[in-house]
Amino acid sequence: MSLSEIVFPPPKYQEYVFGCWTIKAVKSHIMGSSCEAPTKCDDSTEQPCNLCRYERELRLPSLPDMVFASNLLQITHRSGGSISFNCLDALKCVNDREDTIQVAHAEAWKEARADCEYAKKVVKPYDWTFSTNFRGTVDGLKVSDSTERIDLQKLKIPEEIVFYDEVFLYEDELDDNGSTRCVVKVRVMPSGFFAVFRHYLRVDHVIVRVNDTRLYSPSGASYIIRETSSREAPISKLNIPPPIYKNPDQVWQHLPLVSETVDKLSPEDL
């Protein structure tokens, strides 16, 4: 049976309205490694399948092992402006020109993907860890500087969670040399909503990196505070046990801050 003949379950949709914001989460199956169209896509195909669209729009010689091409988290203001997180836009922020991390297993990793048709089309250096500095795709919202920060200590106070979801975008075990993954989580409480988009990278014996984009909007507000941070450290300098640096939700607190950006998203007419 060809991939185009496989019947996948329909995507799962969740939607929650919180004040002037609507939060939508879409979760679907992992993208296949071959064309999913009944008749193979070509350059003239106006609406190609996910894989062929990725090949058209990305310049990466390979893709992560697990790509959730249809998954999405979108937060939309009633005016129509939105910020969204999806796999394609996250991968567009991966460095496609140079290998930013040199490790002993890099060549073996590339050789393991030598049979990939996509890899044969474009052979060049690139960031094989798929590290991304993606901060979300903003459409119809105004981005401005902000001195207001997200109170993480306040968010630790127990509160009823009225809506929650977790959406994976991509993941790869780097040929058993570590882990790279992109996931976005959102939770809504009576006091506001909080979302975290996280890229976690671990290259065994080399480095741990966590790039976070946090979003917070208090109840009744027509704006979102967006904080983006990058943290990383060589594993040799992390005086913590492996179970911690292998846990993205724990290790980020042990990593030194490399860079940080804070801004505010709001409707363009405000």
Residue ranges and their predicted role:
Residues 1-15, 20, 250, 257-270:
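Classical N-terminal secretory signal peptides
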Residues 87-105:
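Short linear, low-complexity motifs centered on an aromatic residue
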Residues 125-270:
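A eukaryote-biased signal for long
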